[in-house]
A protein has these predicted regions:
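Short glycine/proline-enriched turns and hinge-like loops at secondary-structure junctions
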Residues: 64-67, 108-110
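Conserved short histidine dyad/triad with adjacent acidic residue
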Residues: 34-45, 49-66
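Short hydrophobic/aromatic patch on the recognition helix
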Residues: 242, 246, 294-295, 299
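Solvent-exposed residues in well-ordered beta-strands and their adjoining turns
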Residues: 56-57, 76-78, 119-120
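Short, conserved glycine- and acidic-residue-centered signature motifs
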Residues: 66, 208, 259
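Alpha-helical bundle regulatory/interaction domains
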Residues: 1-36, 82-239, 248-253, 268-292, ...
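C-terminal flanking helix
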Residues: 250, 258, 262-267, 300-303
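Short, conserved beta-strand element in jelly-roll/cupin
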Residues: 66-81
Length: 332
């Protein structure tokens, strides 16, 4: 498969023609239901990726192998449609999956509309990281279990990208636009792959809560912004499990909590600093906040005062503490 960019539409009138059109797949397609054959494939390729959406008017039995050097994700275009892929029905929450040169078989119903994403295997491993990439068996897995919202995101993303580049093919010459599309695709893949190692249903509420505690401990003194994947790795669970743990416990996302934690770090440092020598902007920058104006608004909404007001109260006496009262040190 060439890495140059391109977009187009392929229309075929028999299964053998369709087979040839789908190369680099190595497939045998058998038409099962009677009638004149028609298939339409709308595709786009960029940065080594090949995305397409396909319509087939007849029921098909397909056998063969996925393209060498690529992994694939696929799904029917609608939640109601079903495709039998390697012995299991593909539906929301279950994506068709295959590694490089993986033997596959599937039954495609008449009138099927489906989407497929092919991505270079080396890129998939790079985005996943060595640890996750080795756990996800590209040669053995045929199905990728994920949250239904993730599979829906993949479907809609492929539809959007194919439509976008078919309508405006000159965008394929824009490296930044293509790179942004690559990031979106790989982010969706990483979200889906996270659930391969630790399904949400396999992790008890107690284990999720312990993972939540490990995550907030890890985040407590982080000054730099990090992603959810790093936080999940530190907590020893998948991204999806960590997101559920945060929703169950705090009703916030891990991303929101990470920002909240760093804002508290700024507040602690402002409260401990000397007003005549410290600068709010510098303290904010140390904690990874590069937009002082936006930060000041968020800070005021959270703490009810501006960052500069916190800095000015550094000499404020400590409040009465309950332990002081218990020790009889408070006399009023």
């Amino acid at each position: 498969m060439e890495k140059r960019a391109g977009a187009g539409i392929i229309e075929t009138a028999d299964v053998d023609e369709h087979c040839e059109a789908l190369r680099p797949w190595d497939l045998t397609i058998r038409q099962v239901s009677p009638g004149k054959y028609r298939a339409r494939t709308e595709y786009v390729s960029f940065n080594g990726f090949l995305l397409y959406r396909e319509q087939c008017c007849r029921r098909l039995m397909v056998t063969g192998a996925t393209p060498a050097g690529y992994i694939m994700l696929g799904s029917p275009s609608t939640a109601e449609a079903r495709i039998d892929w390697c012995g299991a029905e593909i539906h929301p929450g279950r994506l068709a999956f295959g590694g490089s040169s993986t033997e596959i078989d599937c039954v495609v119903p008449a009138g099927s509309h489906h989407v497929v994403a092919l991505m270079p295997e080396y890129l998939a491993r790079t985005y996943l990281g060595e640890a996750s990439g080795s756990k996800l068996s590209f040669s053995k897995c045929r199905h990728l279990i994920c949250h239904p919202s993730v599979s829906e995101s993949l479907i809609q993303l492929v539809h959007r990208l194919v439509h976008k580049y078919l309508e405006c093919r000159e965008l394929l010459a824009d490296r930044e636009v293509c790179k942004a599309s690559e990031f979106k695709l790989m982010d969706t893949f990483v979200q889906a792959a996270d659930t391969m190692d630790a399904g949400v249903g396999c992790v008890s509420a107690r284990e999720r809560h312990l993972a939540f505690l490990r995550a907030i401990e890890y985040a407590e003194h982080l000054q730099r912004p990090i992603g959810v994947s790093e936080l999940a790795s530190a907590a020893g669970v998948s991204r999806r499990v960590l997101e559920l743990a945060f929703r169950e416990t705090l009703s916030v996302t891990p991303v929101a909590y990470l920002r909240l934690s760093r804002m508290h770090g700024v507040r602690r440092e402002l409260a401990a600093a000397a007003p005549d020598s410290a600068r709010v902007k510098e303290i904010c920058a140390r904690w990874g906040f590069s937009e002082p104006g936006r930060f000041a608004v968020d800070y005021g909404r959270l703490f009810g005062e501006s960052p500069s007001a916190t800095l000015r109260t550094c000499s404020k006496p400590l409040p009465i503490r309950l332990k002081d009262a218990l020790r009889g040190r408070v006399m009023r």
